[in-house]
Every structure is written in C-alpha cells, then in structure tokens.
From Swiss-Prot:
Location(s) in or outside the cell: Secreted; Target cell membrane
Role according to the record: Antimicrobial and mast cell degranulating peptide which probably acts by forming pores in membranes. Active against both Gram-negative and Gram-positive bacterial strains as well as against yeasts. Has little hemolytic activity. In the context of inflammation and cancer tests, is weakly cytotoxic to normal cells, induces calcium signaling but does not impact cAMP production. In addition, prevents LPS-induced nitric oxid (NO) synthesis but does not affect the IP3 signaling and pro-inflammatory activation of endothelial cells.
Listed name of the protein: Antimicrobial peptide Xac-4
Gene Ontology cellular component terms for the protein in this record: extracellular region; membrane; other organism cell membrane
Keyword RNA-binding: no
Organism: Xylocopa violacea
Amino acid sequence: GVLSLLKKFTMILKHVHVN
C-alpha cells in the first residue's frame, strides 16, 4: 500500500542522510 511505500522511502532517505 501507500503507507508501505512511504515507509520504504523514509528508510531509504534516512539511510542516505546517515551516509
């Protein structure tokens, strides 16, 4: 669903921000 996609996107964004 949309929530799952948003969650995934947030995780990726977080990962990029950390690196």
